[in-house]
Amino acid sequence: MKRAIAIAASGGELWGALKEDEQVVELRATRGGSASRVGEIWLARIVGLRPELPAALVDIGLARPALLSAEDVAPKSRFKILREGETVVIEIAKDARADKAAGVTMRLSRSLAPPANGKPPQRLDEPAPAVAALIAPWLDPAPDAIAVDDRAIYADLRNWLRARHPALVAGLVAANEALYESSGIADAVEQALASRLALPGGGFLLVEPTALGVAVDVDSGTARSAVAVNLEAARAVARQIRLRNLSGPMIVGFVGMKGKGERARVLATLAKALARHVPDCQVLGWTRLGHVELVRKRKAPSLAESIAAARH
């Protein structure tokens, strides 16, 4: 399978697309300095303990203290002896949201020693260009090619890759055309923001994010058998969860089927597709009302949220 990254500057927005065999499977967007802060390493100070969670509150210079859960303390046994005022080296694992604090971890992706006389909060790693934060999650496994349609962004990314991922420099290309349209980003964005998605064989999905979770309804729309529609829908659901970066609780309402065998076949198809596209998404099974329940831990904003932030 060929993996490639396309980076497009369009209308003041910076877009990144991960493509597998020429199909856009993931999208990310940012504007100016609004890129994700995930991966930043900080010398931080513990400003509070929440044993009921269990977690510690950590000052990294944001308006609200970040959350360091006991599971993210290294070693885990150290959580019991953490004290308010203690300094720790952490890495940002989840961006802050309007209603939630940033999540941090002591399990660093790379080793950095704190300065001898450092005073928290203090960033320890070198600030990366916005484009680096945009595509960092897609660099392992290494992509076969990275195309950029903006010369300044190309130069920033080339310098960053030389310092951090020198093996990827050879695959970096300065595109001579606007990639937002030509690489399929525009079409993928339109699809990812649509509440109704047509299935190739007939029928469609209705995808509705709500305050309680994401609801997905499958409509046959044709005289095709329920099983045929549901099997196609199961694969499409997995692709859409990945493309839209959906998370939290999700309910999928498949077209009604006749027996347990058909339901088992659809569930197995869904599980296989999820394992390929979003392996961190759990299948909880059929509910008593005949829906399939899924859950995926939130690690980053959904694509719709990222686009809204980039356009704010």
Which residues fall in each region the model found?
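Single-stranded RNA-binding surfaces
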Residues: 1-312
